[in-house]
Curated annotation (Swiss-Prot):
Keywords: Electron transport, Transport. This is Protein FixA. The keyword Electron transport applies. SUPFAM superfamilies: Adenine nucleotide alpha hydrolases-like (SSF52402). It comes from Escherichia coli O81 (strain ED1a). Pathway: Amine and polyamine metabolism; carnitine metabolism. Heterodimer of FixA and FixB. It comes from the Bacteria. InterPro entries: ET-Flavoprotein_bsu_CS, ETF_a/b_N, ETF_b, ETF_beta_N, FixA, Rossmann-like_a/b/a_fold. Belongs to the ETF beta-subunit/FixA family. Required for anaerobic carnitine reduction. May bring reductant to CaiA. GO terms for molecular function: electron transfer activity.
Length: 256
């Protein structure tokens, strides 16, 4: 059983600054970290490894220079995967969901898999598209919002999803792609033994050419900016007469 768990390196949000001039975001001082939602996918994959016979967990990521960081690689491997594959290329630095999914699908095909796990979204864009797009590209079943994995056999995965008024149980034929919600588990903090052992695990570094990927992105990101802050008008209306009520209503109309 070959399980791939996908993750994304994202900027640490506490270190992101906003440029006052145009509202653009400054990532220059933000260290990269594993997307919070993908930690649940990594944990779920490693829990499945304990259930499946001869299961192997491969962590897979696509991106730019952030994936060259040795500390980041060790962080991923210390959480339980047996090996790590990173696909690094400058064109993937700010890849949008469609391109990310295409690269992940190509890399997964080269690596081989029975099951692909990922988080419902990423901590930066949270587009909630990549998992389903990977399934579409590979032409295999894809399910998102999975809150519990009930069982795994050689050819079937049984899962639960929490819907608005009910709990849905699904049996999914393998191979498949599953995007898990944060309700599925609580990611463990790696032990010192796991951190030290991570340095001994294999890491494969692939380029776009290595996976036969040469498609250009269908669209590109133009700008990411923080919302403009409006100054408070500090209008105070005193009294409860008809004129004051009318003035209050008029000011409300201006801001609604």
């Amino acid at each position: 059983m070959k399980i791939i768990t996908c993750y994304k390196c994202v900027p640490d949000e506490q270190d992101i600054a906003v440029n006052n001039a145009d509202g653009s975001l400054d990532f220059s001082k933000a260290d990269a970290k594993i997307s919070q939602y993908d930690l649940n996918a990594i944990e779920a994959a490693c829990q499945l490894k304990q259930q499946a016979v001869e299961a192997q967990v491969t962590a897979l990521s696509v991106g730019g220079k952030a994936l060259t960081n040795a500390k980041g690689r060790k962080d991923v491997l210390s959480r339980g995967p047996d090996e790590l594959i990173v696909v690094i290329d400058d064109q993937f630095e700010q890849a949008l969901p469609q391109q990310t999914a295409s690269v992940l699908a190509a890399a997964a095909q080269k690596a081989g898999f029975d099951l692909i796990l990922c988080g419902d979204g990423s901590s930066d864009l949270y587009a909630q598209q990549v998992g389903l797009l990977v399934g579409e590209i590979l032409n295999i079943p894809a399910v998102n919002g999975v809150s519990k994995i009930i069982s795994l056999t050689a050819d079937t995965l049984t899962v639960e999803r929490e819907l608005e008024d009910e709990t849905e149980t699904l049996s999914i034929p393998l191979p498949a792609v599953v995007a898990v919600s944060t309700d599925i588990n609580s990611p463990q903090i790696p032990s010192m033994k796991a951190i030290l052992g991570a340095a001994k695990k294999p890491v494969q570094v692939w380029s776009a050419a290595d996976i036969g990927f040469n498609a250009e992105a269908a669209w590109s990101e133009q700008q990411v900016a923080a919302p403009k802050q409006r100054e408070r008008q500090r209008i105070v209306i005193e009294g409860d007469g008809e004129e004051q009520i009318a003035a209050f209503a008029e000011n409300l109309r201006k801001v609604i």
